[in-house]
Amino acid sequence: SLTKTXXTIIXAMWAKRLFTSYPQTKTYFPHFDLHPDSAQLRKNIDNIHSALSKLSELHAYILRVDPVNFKLLSHXFLV
C-alpha cells in the first residue's frame, strides 16, 4: 500500500506527465476523470499496482498492443 505522500506524488505525476506530455493519449481514456479533486483517482490511487497489472495484461494479451508503445508511457513517468 502506498503512503499518503507517495500517493500524492503519483497523482501529481500522472496528471502532469502523461496527459500533458502526450495530450493525444486523452482520446484513449475518455472515461477517466482527471480533475485534481477526482473521486475516481482518489479511490484507485492506493491500488495502482493492481490496476496497472490488469492494464498490462489487457494490452499485452487481449488487445495485443505493440510493446514499443509502452516506451511512451514509461517515458512520461520518468520525465
Swiss-Prot record:
Globin domain location: 1-79
According to its UniProt entry, this protein's organism is: Notamacropus eugenii (Tammar wallaby)
Give the protein family: Belongs to the globin family.
What biological process terms from GO does the record include?
hydrogen peroxide catabolic process
- Indicate where the modification Phosphoserine is found in the sequence: S38, S53
This protein is called: Hemoglobin subunit zeta
Q: Which SUPFAM superfamilies match?
A: Globin-like
Any idea which residues bear N-acetylserine here? S1
Subunit details for this protein?
Answer: Heterotetramer of two zeta chains and two epsilon chains.
Q: What does this protein do?
A: The zeta chain is an alpha-type chain of mammalian embryonic hemoglobin.
Q: Name one GO cellular component term.
A: haptoglobin-hemoglobin complex
A molecular function annotated in GO for this UniProt entry is:
oxygen binding
